[in-house]
């Protein structure tokens, strides 16, 4: 079962990804985890990636793609994988196609969790964090018992600077522009499966399981 998971910030990718890997026994592979592992193991590509990251620069595609190729060639990917955060561009998607063709592991589905922008705005701007213990709340989905106060220690709750409406709106616009060509690419390939992410978490996952039902575990 070879899957790519897509969705805008706040769509619930992390939650659905955790459930998929738990139920189907495949590794959850994120770009960040791959970079960290390659740097920790001090592979040639990992060291090259580190040299860019240490300078605050973007890691070039050829290095990222090389790290992805190494990761997908490991034994735990024999029965499949869930890729999260890669690919981000059509060029990366084309490179991934070549890697998977070489390994004989074609993509089964690209699962895109769809959520309207106004719903994402509500989800992302409603987050509040305790200034003392760091516990995260949400004004709509997980509010504190007393507004503005942490249930655990009475600490004052604050909103992160990058959770304000203007910043979140800009971030979503950038993500939407970057993601659309990728969705078009996978739609043309016949891999794309859109899932309604505006339902309850359990209902979203029920739709994901229905989609994956025809695939071997």
Curated annotation (Swiss-Prot):
Its EC number is 2.7.4.3. The keyword Zinc applies. ATP binds at residues 10-15, 127, 136-137, 199. Induction: By superoxide. InterPro entries: Adenyl_kin_sub (IPR006259), Adenylat/UMP-CMP_kin (IPR000850), Adenylat_kinase_CS (IPR033690), Adenylate_kinase_lid-dom (IPR007862), P-loop_NTPase (IPR027417). GO terms for biological process: AMP salvage; nucleoside diphosphate metabolic process; nucleoside monophosphate metabolic process. Residues 30-59 are annotated as: NMP. Optimum temperature is 45 degrees Celsius. Thermal denaturation midpoint (Tm) is 47.6 degrees Celsius and is raised to 66.0 degrees Celsius when AK is complexed with the inhibitor Ap5A. Pathway: Purine metabolism; AMP biosynthesis via salvage pathway; AMP from ADP: step 1/1. Zn(2+) binds at residues 130, 133, 150, 153. Its main location: cytoplasm. It is found in: Cytoplasm. Residues 126-163 are annotated as: LID. It holds the Pfam family ADK. GO terms for cellular component: cytoplasm; cytosol. Catalyzes the reversible transfer of the terminal phosphate group between ATP and AMP. Plays an important role in cellular energy homeostasis and in adenine nucleotide metabolism. Belongs to the adenylate kinase family. Monomer. This is Adenylate kinase. It comes from Bacillus subtilis (strain 168).
